[in-house]
């Protein structure tokens, strides 16, 4: 008598067919109102009124930030790591780097006993 168990291999499920966007219908510009270009001004209106309000706001922000001075980000990085005199870093992942090739390392002579940082 042979044993007939359930197979562990399952056939992949059929994928549902989704129509491509061009088959559904055209995109209506009112759905994406911020991407639509503004209407051209009439002859009587000055061209300065049709400027993008975001562009005008950027100009105001630049003037306000220019008077504040340098950003304190560089200072905060120095405060987190005290200086020890030897500024050797382990590497980008915090792991130690491979030791140098012994053939390339020069032995320190008398008077040159300083650290090789």
From Swiss-Prot:
Expressed in a variety of tumor tissues but not in normal tissues, except testis. InterPro entries: GAGE, GAGE_fam. Residues 1-117 are annotated as: Disordered. Residues 32-45, 87-96 have a biased composition (Acidic residues). Transmembrane segments: none annotated. This gene belongs to a family of genes organized in clustered repeats. They have a high degree of predicted sequence identity, but differ by scattered single nucleotide substitution. Their sequences contain either the antigenic peptide YYWPRPRRY or YRPRPRRY which is recognized by cytotoxic T-cells. Antigen, recognized on melanoma by autologous cytolytic T-lymphocytes. Belongs to the GAGE family. This is G antigen 1. It comes from Homo sapiens (Human). The gene is GAGE1.
């Amino acid at each position: 008598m042979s044993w007939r168990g359930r197979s562990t291999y399952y056939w992949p499920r059929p994928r549902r067919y989704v129509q491509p966007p061009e088959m559904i219908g055209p995109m209506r510009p009112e759905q994406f109102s911020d991407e639509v270009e503004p209407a051209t001004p009439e002859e009587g209106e000055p061209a300065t009124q049709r400027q993008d309000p975001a562009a005008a706001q950027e100009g105001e922000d630049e003037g306000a930030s220019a008077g504040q001075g340098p950003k304190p980000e560089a200072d905060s990085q120095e405060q987190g790591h005290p200086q020890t005199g030897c500024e050797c870093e382990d590497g980008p992942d915090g792991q130690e780097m491979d030791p140098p090739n012994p053939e390339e390392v020069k032995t320190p002579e008398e008077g040159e006993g300083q650290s090789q940082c």
